[in-house]
Amino acid sequence: MKMPLTWYSWFLLSAWILNTGAEISITPEPAQPAEGDNVTLVVHGLSGELLAYNWYAGPTLSLTFLVASYIVSTGDETPGPAHTGREAVRPDGSLDIHGALPGHTGTYILQTLNRQFQTEVGYGHMQVYEILAPPTVMANDTALVERRDTLRLVCSSPSPAEVRWFFNGDALPVAVRLGMSPDGRMLTRHGVRREEAGAYQCEVWNPVSVSRSEPLNLTVYFGPERVAILQDSTTRTGCTIKVDFNMSLTLWCVARSCPEPEYVWAFNGKALKNGQDHLNISSMTAAHEGTYTCIAKNSKTLLSGSASVVVKLSAAAVAMMIVPVPTKPTEGQDVTLTVQGYPKDLLVYAWYRGPASEPNRLLSQLPSGNWIAGPAHTGREVGFANCSLLVQKLNLTDAGRYTLKTVTLQGKTDTLEVELQVAPLE
């Protein structure tokens, strides 16, 4: 039968004579219990015939810390103020704790009384470890600008535990580049770098439990850097690209940047309506010669960069020649007699059907840029500023020799001929 301790009983217990020669030790089993485990505080070194035990959960023999008193002869156990409802004293003096909680962590004292009314005291310590919940990685921001912003990561966990950090799944070296707080729960990087973009996790652990957070993904904005213009299958010397007449050319703008930059193209200093990373020239002519500039802009870093190339007709294309497009037109089609390498200082030109004589003149272009029809004009011919001639809706009688005559501002005259073939419809 459990009897409450009277004031007189407590007086007797406090008046016991201490036996200083005793060596009582207390060890928990299991040695590293997890919350919820059943734990026994096993007593070693008891000697002689004992009358009673007092268990304390605290640093001193104070009534406040008394868990229970136990009378050996009767088996009576009396709970004390520190009893949680989970403790029970064994006849051998050991203390059972059912479903131990982290709050049971601390110093335990066993006080014994023998028949000579001498007391012995033993001390022990027990650490009850929590089953850890997953922590959370928190950041001051998950999208930062390189070399401008500061990164702060915090591993948030309600439980005291050791902390490890992981970057892209691998253990993060101890503060090689990132400053770590003394408790390991905060990482700080002033002037964050692009190499530090990726997935961060933290892991909390104790001897009985390990738990890792979900990844937190960090983006670091940078650039644009190393802006360059690339091209496919053309001859390039330094910043000059040479292209054959009537050939196509694609210019690509590349840059190192996060996020991908916005692109603006300019031709001879004038902006083009093209927001793509590439620029196409479908058919190279003298009108396409000039300086092409790509400007890359990063909306996050507010930085920009540019690159330029000079595009020219190749040397082989400079000599004036006439190329029909298409090269083998059929009856009913339109054909353009495209002029390659026409004079840059052109004053006037004239097209003839056959030899360059007035009756054969199809049309002429005046210095004003307008063209006028000649005696041989059929109403299907159109002239262009680059000296090209369009003949619409071909018939078989359009086949034959065509002559182009040009006059420059310096008075230089050139004559060039081409033979046009028209295939009949099948």
Swiss-Prot record:
Pfam family, one: Ig_3
Ig-like C2-type domain span: 134-219, 224-310
GO biological process, one term: sensory perception of sound
One Gene Ontology term of the molecular function aspect: identical protein binding
Start-end of Basic and acidic residues biased regions: 84-95
Knocked-out gene: effects: Mutant mice show loss of striated-sheet matrix and Hensen's stripe, a prominent feature in the basal two-thirds of the tectorial membrane. They have enhanced spontaneous, stimulus-frequency, and transiently evoked otoacoustic emissions.
Tissue: Expressed in cochlear outer hair cells (OHC).
InterPro entries the record matches: CEA_cell_adhesion (IPR050831), Ig-like_dom (IPR007110), Ig-like_dom_sf (IPR036179), Ig-like_fold (IPR013783), Ig_sub (IPR003599), Ig_sub2 (IPR003598), Ig_V-set (IPR013106)
GO cellular component: extracellular space; stereocilium tip
Gene3D superfamilies: Immunoglobulins
Highest taxon of the lineage: Eukaryota
Effect of residue 142 to P: Does not affect the interaction with TECTA nor subcellular localization
S-S bonds: 155-202, 253-294
Localisation per UniProt entry: Secreted
Residues with glycosylation annotation: 38, 217
Keywords from the UniProt entry: Disulfide bond, Glycoprotein, Immunoglobulin domain, Repeat, Secreted, Signal
Coiled-coil regions, chain positions: none
Family: Belongs to the immunoglobulin superfamily. CEA family.
Quaternary structure, from the entry: Homooligomer; can for homodimers and homotetramers. Interacts with TECTA and TECTB.
Functional description taken from the UniProt entry: Required for proper hearing, plays a role in maintaining the integrity of the tectorial membrane.
Name of this chain's protein: Cell adhesion molecule CEACAM16
